[in-house]
């Protein structure tokens, strides 16, 4: 099956800095593809090159099996991290203005309903909240009925309720068969929304797969957590890594059943036990490090 979008040997250099270092990947129709990485990893440059905002140094970009054409910008939707809009226009007037720029467009009333804009559609652009603005920018990205949608950190700065609401909208868009490229610093968001993920660092793709595949390969261990007062064993009696964290004991294991059987056989009280499963954030930190980057 021909991918909707295919990137081959993409390179972008700025003088002596290689921002994107010979990366390749393909995205199939109807998937949500997450491009993740720490600050400076090259993901924003990659997205900007694919969007045709920045010219690549070398490499090829194919859309529907053909080299990307000038019409590409008319066929995709982009929600940037931030967009400057005219403050003298209302939300609905702005939607109408953007609609006039395209031949193929969605009905404004449909977008207003889907993105829950009705309550503030007659307010000025600079008079709406952060959560309302993100839903509004999503509606603008959908105005030309794109098959491919770029969402660049769409939930940054949103409170948990507004973020979950945005996730629901993205899920609705996926159900319509649209293809999404998502960048985000929220690993929970990527794990919840993405079918496939590429993790970038220093301009290269260092891991690629579904969230479950990445967790299984790069962070398979689970953590069994017990109150320290209930752990009456010498850690040397166990053949598993054990560490003390504040007033708890953490046991790392690839086989939870075997771990629990071992603890019970040594008379450990499991009544206040908790089990922490690995997640995408664990994978991300294991691969890219825990040191803060500017």
Identify the function of each model-found stretch.
Residues 168-252:
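ABC transporter nucleotide-binding domain
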Residues 149-153:
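Catalytic Walker B motif of ABC-type/P-loop ATPase nucleotide-binding domains
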Residues 124-128:
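Conserved ABC ATPase signature
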Residues 96, 100, 105-120:
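Conserved ABC ATPase "signature" region
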Residues 51:
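Helix-to-loop junction immediately C-terminal to a conserved catalytic motif
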Residues 59-72:
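Conserved ABC transporter NBD signature motif
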Residues 221-294:
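Short, charged/small-residue-rich alpha-helical element at the C-terminal edge
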């Amino acid at each position: 099956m021909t991918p909707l979008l295919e990137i081959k040997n993409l390179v972008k250099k700025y003088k002596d800095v290689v921002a994107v270092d010979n990366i390749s990947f393909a995205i199939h129709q109807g998937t949500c593809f997450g491009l993740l990485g720490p600050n400076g990893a090259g993901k924003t440059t990659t997205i900007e090159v694919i969007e045709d905002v920045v010219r690549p140094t070398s490499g090829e970009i194919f859309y529907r099996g053909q080299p990307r054409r000038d019409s590409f910008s008319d066929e995709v939707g982009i929600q940037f991290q931030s967009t400057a809009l005219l403050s003298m226009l209302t939300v609905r007037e702005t939607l109408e203005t953007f609609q006039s720029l395209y031949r193929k467009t969605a009905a404004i009333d449909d977008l207003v309903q889907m993105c829950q804009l009705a309550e503030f559609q007659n307010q000025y652009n600079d008079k709406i909240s952060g959560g309302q603005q993100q839903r509004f920018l999503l509606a603008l990205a959908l105005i030309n009925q794109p098959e491919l949608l770029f969402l660049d950190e769409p939930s940054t700065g949103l409170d948990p309720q507004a973020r979950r609401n945005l996730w629901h909208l993205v899920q609705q868009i996926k159900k319509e068969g649209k293809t999404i490229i998502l960048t985000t610093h929220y690993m929970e968001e990527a794990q919840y929304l993405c079918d496939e993920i590429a993790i970038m660092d220093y301009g290269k793709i260092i891991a690629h797969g579904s969230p479950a595949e990445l967790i299984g390969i790069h962070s398979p261990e689970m953590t069994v957590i017990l109150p320290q007062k209930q752990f009456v064993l010498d850690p040397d009696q166990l053949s598993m890594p054990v560490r003390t964290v504040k007033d708890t004991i953490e046991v790392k294991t690839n086989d939870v059943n075997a771990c629990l059987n071992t603890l019970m056989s040594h008379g450990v009280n499991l009544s206040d036990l908790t089990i922490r499963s690995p997640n995408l954030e664990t994978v991300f930190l294991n691969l890219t490090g825990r040191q803060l980057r500017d």
